[in-house]
From Swiss-Prot:
One GO CC term, this protein: cytosol
Keywords: Amino-acid biosynthesis, ATP-binding, Diaminopimelate biosynthesis, Kinase, Lysine biosynthesis, Nucleotide-binding, Repeat, Transferase
Organism this protein belongs to: Corynebacterium glutamicum (strain ATCC 13032 / DSM 20300 / JCM 1318 / BCRC 11384 / CCUG 27702 / LMG 3730 / NBRC 12168 / NCIMB 10025 / NRRL B-2784 / 534)
Notes on how activity is controlled: Feedback inhibition by lysine and threonine, but he enzyme is moderately inhibited by lysine alone, and threonine alone has no effect.
Covalent S-S links between cysteines: none
Top-level taxonomic group: Bacteria
Protein name from the UniProt record: Aspartokinase
Length: 421
């Protein structure tokens, strides 16, 4: 008997009809001889609606109370799915994140899972029940306060539970039926991938793929939890994410796909003194404010005045805050200026095949040249090339790269709804 953890996104649970459809799938999995644990996101746009409601009551709501409010969304869908399963003649028991033993750090709004002690879930499984766990939430061990896990928290909940329960597979259900070589809404002939290594999926998640959040893939890799990305609208087996890139034979290594990201902003510090410790001051101030940095470029030092320019990208949502911090440092450091640009986007090519295929970088650059796309920043890893370009050029760049590396097929991809959640 296998133990299967299934996670259903908000689009899969946005109405009573879809909840019943999900319940039928869950019961079918149980009848096939599996133990089943289900992690639910909030229904449809419930989380956004709760955020709007909170803002109407208090423009700056306390973080603790916001977490109390937002976790209600998952508890609602949790109970409804359990009810739907019971109506089909199967036994189900729902759990909040804290009841399921999801223990987190104290940070409200973006807590991290530190441990999972799923004793009550195991007991219910031993009794033959289907266990339904509210995603996106946990509890801090010291304060006992409810916490939320941030964007994609339900994916992370599912993977963490799968690891703690030693599950055979963690299935992530949404409105897409797998991981594609590109976003089918941008590249219509994008092809679904049957299998990816953890490293390839980590790179795709890090550079903009919305199918799985980075934290969930990191967790899966750390605990070797096989992931399967599937659609709740079809019976297609989807994409399996498992194993290491090192296990892929050299002759089978390929280029995996193209991803785009519109969530970043570019910040440039002009005229900063080019001496030890100056760049460290910039990035320490941003780190203390918990602002993540992605791409970084430092220009060659000016011989005349001993200064240089530093350009980096950060989440657009943190861009204004980063500027406020750096403007204060500008006065202390006597920098020339600090510039902000949020009309940029990142396009990336990922694949284990880069290690064994010389010339990939040249072809990448030539493909963008041929569609008149200018490159502003470049970042690479062993299996990835990313460039920062104008946001308006992203779609054309993605299509050009997809065609250049022959990643497409003859048929158009099936898009059930399109959000990937």
């Amino acid at each position: 008997m296998a133990l299967v953890v299934q996670k259903y996104g908000g689009s899969s649970l946005e109405s009573a009809e879809r909840i019943r459809n999900v319940a039928e799938r869950i019961v079918a999995t149980k009848k096939a001889g599996n133990d089943v644990v289900v992690v639910c996101s909030a229904m449809g746009d419930t989380t956004d609606e709760l955020l709007e409601l909170a803002a109407a009551v208090n423009p700056v709501p306390p973080a603790r109370e916001m977490d109390m409010l937002l976790t209600a969304g998952e508890r609602i869908s949790n109970a409804l799915v359990a009810m739907a399963i019971e109506s089909l003649g199967a036994e189900a028991q729902s759990f909040t994140g804290s009841q399921a033993g999801v223990l987190t750090t104290e940070r409200h709004g973006n807590a991290r899972i530190v441990d999972v002690t799923p004793g009550r879930v195991r007991e219910a499984l031993d009794e033959g029940k289907i266990c339904i766990v509210a995603g996106f939430q946990g509890v801090n061990k010291e304060t006992r306060d409810v916490t939320t896990l941030g964007r994609g928290g339900s994916d992370t909940t599912a993977v963490a539970l799968a690891a703690a329960l030693n599950a055979d597979v963690c299935e992530i259900y949404s409105d897409v039926d797998g991981v594609y070589t590109a976003d089918p809404r941008i590249v219509p002939n994008a092809q679904k991938l049957e299998k990816l290594s953890f490293e390839e999926m980590l790179e795709l998640a890090a550079v903009g793929s919305k199918i799985l959040v980075l934290r969930s893939v990191e967790y899966a890799r750390a605990f070797n939890v096989p992931l399967r990305v599937r659609s709740s609208y079809s019976n297609d087996p989807g994409t399996l994410i498992a194993g290491s890139m090192e296990d892929i034979p050299v002759e089978e290594a390929v280029l995996t796909g193209v991803a785009t990201d519109k969530s970043e902003a570019k910040v440039t510090v002009l005229g900063i003194s080019d001496k030890p410790g100056e760049a460290a001051k910039v990035f320490r101030a941003l780190a203390d404010a918990e602002i993540n940095i992605d791409m970084v470029l430092q220009n060659v030092s000016s011989v005349e005045d001993g200064t240089t320019d530093i350009t980096f990208t950060c989440p657009r949502s943190d861009g204004r805050r980063a500027m406020e911090i750096l403007k204060k440092l500008q006065v202390q450091g006597n920098w020339t200026n600090v510039l902000y640009d949020d009309q940029v986007g990142k396009v990336s090519l990922v694949g284990a095949g880069m290690k064994s295929h010389p010339g990939v970088t040249a072809e990448f650059m030539e493909a963008l040249r041929d569609v008149n796309v200018n490159i502003e920043l470049i970042s690479t890893s062993e299996i990835r090339i990313s460039v920062l370009i104008r946001e308006d050029d992203l779609d054309a760049a993605a299509r050009a790269l997809h065609e250049q590396f022959q990643l497409g097929g003859e048929d158009e991809a099936v898009v059930y709804a399109g959000t990937g959640r």
